[in-house]
C-alpha cells in the first residue's frame, strides 16, 4: 500500500470519529497542561526566595504532579478503550476489504501519533501560555508578593513529553493486542456486542458489604487524630473495594430480586429499565463505581483544602497563644521561669512595645500506664504496656488552669485535685504511682483536644508547683534520663504592626541568646522561642499550597468524571438505539419509550452521587480528626465547607446529566419533548 494512504486514512478516521476524539483530545490537552503547570511551579525559582515554607510548598506541588500523572494513565486508558470498542466495526470493514492487520496497525499507530502530538503539543502550549497566570494565582493564595518573570521550564517540558508519550505508546500497544487477537467477524460486531447477563455473585456482594462496612466503621468510630491518620488510607482502600464490589455484584442481586417480584417487574417502564440494566450491568457497574469514587474524591479534596485555608486564623490561634511564645524545660521551674519572664518583659520594653496580655503556665507532663483505674509509672517497654493503655498525665497549678482555660476551680487542700478528662472517669480518687489523691471536682473536655498524639490526656489540677514535686521525683526515679522536666511557657500579646511584632520577637530571641540562658545550665534546661507573626507566613504558604493543589485536583477529577459520564451515555445510546426501536414496533408509544429512558438514566446518574455523599458523610469524623492534627478544630467550618462543596458539585453534576441526556436522545433518535 502507498505510504501516504496510511496517513490519509488516519486523519480521515479521526475526523469521522470526531464526536469521540474531540473530547478525548481536549481533555488530554488539559491533563498535559495541568501536569506541566505543576512541574513549572515546582521548579519555579521564585519559590526558592520564599522566606519561610518554600520546602512545604514545593513538596505539595511535587505531590500534585505525581497524583496528576497517576490519574492521567487511568483516564487515558479508560477513554481509549471506550473509543476502540466503538471503532471495532469500522476496523473490521477495513479488514474484510483487504487490509491486513499489519496495515491496520500502521493506521492506528499514526492515529495515536497524531493524537499524542495534538494533546502533548496543545497541552504544553496552553500550560506555557497560562503559566504566569497560574503562578500569580499560587502567589496570591500563599500570600507571597514578588515579581513574576516569564520563563519556560525545560525540565518540565521534557518530563511532560516523556510521561505522556509513554502513556500514548501504551495505549497503542493495547489497541494493537486488541486487533491482533480479534477475528474479522469479531471486529465487525465488536461495537454492538452487549454484556451477557451476569450471574449473581453472592460472594463478591458479601465481600463488598463487609469491606464497605469495615471502612465506614473505621471512619465513624476512630477516637483520636493520629489513629485517624494511620487508618485513613486503609479505610479509603476498603471503601473503594466495597464500592466496586457492591456496584458490580450487589446491584445485580438487587435487580434480579426486583425481576422476581412479578407485580413490580411486569410493568412496561420497570420491565424495560430493569431488564436493560441487568443485561449490561457488569459494564455499567464499573463505570458507575468509578464515577462514585471520583465524585467522592472531588468532595473530600476541595472541602478539606478550602476549610483548612478558611480556618487559618483559628489554626494559628490554636497553635500560637500569643504574639511571642517562650517556653523553658527545667528542673528548677520557679527560679529559671521568673528569670526568663523578667528578661522577656525587659526586652519588649526596650523595643518600645506595650504588653497587651501576658499569660504564664507551669506544667509537668509524663506518661503512665492505666491499670484498673490507677495510673502506674512504668517504662513503656515493660511487659503488659500497650499504646491504648498509656495516659499522658499533665499536672498544672490551680491558678494557671483557671487563667489558661477560663474555668473556675474550687480551693484545694493537700492531696485534693481537680481531674479533667475526655472520658468518663467514675472514681472519687485517683492513684498515681504510690500517691492517692481525692478528686474534689471532675471536668470534661472535648476528645478532639484530649489526646497527646495517640494517647489520652488527663489534666490533674493541684494547688501549687510544690504539690507536683512528689510525682516529679517518682517519675524521675523510674524513667531516669528519659524523665520529664517541668515545663514553663510564657505567651505575650504586644501592640504594633506585623513588622514591628516580628522585630520584637527577633529581639527577644537575640536577648535570650546573648544572656546565655539558651544554652542551659549543665544541660538541665532547654528554651524554645516562637514568633507568631513570622511563622504565620509559613502556615499561609503551606495551606495556600494545599488549597491550590486541592482546586487543581478537584478540577482534574471533575473533568475525568464528566468525560466518563459522557462516554458512558454515548455507549448507552448506541446500545439502546436498536432495542428501543424494537420496543416501539411491539407496541410501546413514543411517550412510553421516553419515560422508560428517563427512568433508567435517572437511576444510573443518581446512584453514584448519592453514594458519594454517603461516603463523605461517613468519613466526616475521620477527616475532621485529621484536620485537628493540623490545628483545625472548627468542626462547624468544615461542615459548612463540605455542605457547600456537595451543593456546588451536585449542581454541576445535574447540568452534566441534562447535557448528556440530550446527547443520549439524539443517538436513539428521540427528542426531549
Regions found by a protein language model. Give the residues of each.
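N-terminal Sec/SRP start-transfer signal
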Residues: 1-32, 197-202, 211, 247-295, ...
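Short cytosolic juxtamembrane segments of multi-pass membrane proteins
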Residues: 3-8, 181-195, 574-575, 665-673
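Hydrophobic alpha-helical transmembrane segments of multi-pass inner-membrane transport and secretion
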Residues: 19-46, 55-92, 113-126, 206, ...
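Short helix-loop junctions at transmembrane helix boundaries
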Residues: 40-51, 55, 124-156, 213-231, ...
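Juxtamembrane interface at the cytosolic side of transmembrane helices
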Residues: 78, 86, 178, 224, ...
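Hydrophobic alpha-helical segments
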Residues: 114-258
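Basic-flanked hydrophobic alpha-helices used for secretion and membrane insertion
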Residues: 315-329, 335-559
Amino acid at each position: 500500500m502507498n505510504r501516504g494512504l496510511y496517513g490519509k486514512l488516519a486523519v480521515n478516521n479521526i475526523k469521522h470519529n470526531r464526536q469521540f476524539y474531540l473530547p478525548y483530545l481536549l481533555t488530554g490537552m488539559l491533563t498535559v497542561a495541568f501536569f506541566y503547570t505543576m512541574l513549572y511551579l515546582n521548579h519555579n525559582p521564585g519559590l526558592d526566595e520564599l522566606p519561610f515554607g518554600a520546602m512545604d510548598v514545593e513538596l505539595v506541588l511535587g505531590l500534585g504532579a505525581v497524583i496528576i500523572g497517576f490519574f492521567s494513565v487511568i483516564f487515558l486508558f479508560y477513554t481509549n478503550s471506550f473509543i476502540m470498542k466503538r471503532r471495532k466495526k469500522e476496523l473490521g470493514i477495513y479488514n474484510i476489504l483487504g487490509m491486513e492487520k499489519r496495515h491496520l496497525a500502521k493506521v492506528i499507530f499514526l492515529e495515536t501519533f497524531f493524537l499524542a502530538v495534538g494533546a502533548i503539543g496543545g497541552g504544553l502550549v496552553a500550560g506555557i501560555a497560562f503559566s504566569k497566570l497560574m503562578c500569580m494565582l499560587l502567589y496570591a493564595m500563599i500570600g507571597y508578593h514578588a515579581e513574576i518573570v516569564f520563563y519556560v521550564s525545560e525540565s518540565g517540558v521534557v518530563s511532560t513529553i516523556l510521561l505522556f508519550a509513554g502513556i500514548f505508546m501504551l495505549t497503542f500497544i493495547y489497541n494493537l493486542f486488541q486487533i491482533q487477537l480479534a477475528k474479522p467477524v469479531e471486529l465487525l460486531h465488536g461495537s454492538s456486542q452487549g454484556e451477557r447477563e451476569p450471574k449473581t455473585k453472592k460472594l463478591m456482594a458479601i465481600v463488598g458489604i463487609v469491606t464497605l462496612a469495615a471502612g465506614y466503621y473505621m471512619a465513624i468510630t476512630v477516637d483520636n487524630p493520629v489513629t485517624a491518620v494511620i487508618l485513613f488510607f486503609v479505610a479509603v482502600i476498603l471503601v473503594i473495594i466495597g464500592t466496586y464490589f457492591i456496584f458490580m455484584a450487589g446491584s445485580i442481586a438487587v435487580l434480579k430480586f426486583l425481576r422476581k417480584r412479578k407485580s413490580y417487574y411486569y410493568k412496561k417502564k420497570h420491565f424495560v429499565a430493569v431488564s436493560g440494566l441487568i443485561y449490561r450491568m457488569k459494564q455499567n457497574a464499573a463505570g458507575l463505581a468509578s464515577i462514585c469514587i471520583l465524585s467522592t474524591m472531588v468532595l473530600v479534596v476541595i472541602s478539606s483544602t478550602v476549610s483548612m485555608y478558611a480556618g487559618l486564623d483559628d489554626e494559628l490561634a490554636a497553635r500560637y497563644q500569643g504574639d511571642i511564645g517562650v517556653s523553658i524545660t527545667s528542673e528548677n521551674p520557679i527560679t529559671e521561669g521568673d528569670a526568663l519572664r523578667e528578661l522577656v518583659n525587659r526586652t519588649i520594653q526596650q523595643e518600645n512595645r506595650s504588653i497587651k496580655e501576658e499569660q504564664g503556665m507551669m506544667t509537668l507532663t509524663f506518661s503512665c500506664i492505666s491499670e484498673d483505674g490507677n495510673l502506674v509509672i512504668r517504662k513503656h517497654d515493660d511487659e503488659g504496656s500497650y499504646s491504648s493503655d498509656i495516659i499522658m498525665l499533665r499536672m498544672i497549678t490551680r491558678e494557671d488552669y483557671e487563667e489558661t482555660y477560663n474555668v473556675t476551680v474550687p480551693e484545694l487542700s493537700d492531696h485534693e485535685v481537680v481531674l479533667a478528662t475526655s472520658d468518663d472517669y467514675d472514681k472519687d480518687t485517683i492513684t498515681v504511682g504510690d500517691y492517692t489523691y481525692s478528686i474534689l471536682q471532675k471536668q470534661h473536655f472535648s476528645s478532639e483536644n484530649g489526646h497527646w498524639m495517640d494517647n489520652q490526656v488527663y489534666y490533674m489540677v493541684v494547688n501549687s508547683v510544690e504539690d507536683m514535686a512528689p510525682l516529679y521525683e517518682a517519675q524521675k526515679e523510674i524513667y531516669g534520663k528519659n524523665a520529664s522536666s517541668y515545663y514553663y511557657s510564657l505567651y505575650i500579646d504586644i501592640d504594633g504592626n506585623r513588622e514591628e511584632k516580628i522585630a520584637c520577637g527577633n529581639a527577644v530571641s537575640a536577648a535570650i541568646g546573648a544572656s546565655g540562658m539558651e544554652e542551659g545550665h549543665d544541660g538541665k534546661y532547654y528554651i524554645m522561642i516562637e514568633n507568631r507573626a513570622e511563622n504565620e507566613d509559613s502556615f499561609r504558604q503551606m495551606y495556600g499550597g494545599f488549597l491550590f493543589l486541592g482546586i487543581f485536583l478537584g478540577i482534574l477529577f471533575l473533568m475525568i468524571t464528566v468525560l466518563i459520564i459522557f462516554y458512558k451515555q454515548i455507549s448507552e445510546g448506541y446500545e439502546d438505539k436498536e432495542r428501543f426501536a424494537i420496543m416501539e414496533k411491539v407496541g410501546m408509544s413514543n411517550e412510553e419509550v421516553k419515560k422508560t429512558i428517563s427512568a433508567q438514566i435517572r437511576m444510573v446518574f443518581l446512584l453514584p452521587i448519592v453514594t458519594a455523599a454517603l461516603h463523605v458523610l461517613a468519613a466526616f469524623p475521620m477527616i475532621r480528626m485529621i484536620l485537628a492534627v493540623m490545628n483545625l478544630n472548627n468542626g462547624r467550618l468544615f461542615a459548612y465547607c463540605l455542605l457547600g462543596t456537595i451543593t456546588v458539585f451536585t449542581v454541576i453534576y445535574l447540568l452534566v446529566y441534562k447535557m448528556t441526556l440530550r446527547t443520549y436522545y439524539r443517538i436513539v433518535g428521540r427528542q426531549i419533548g
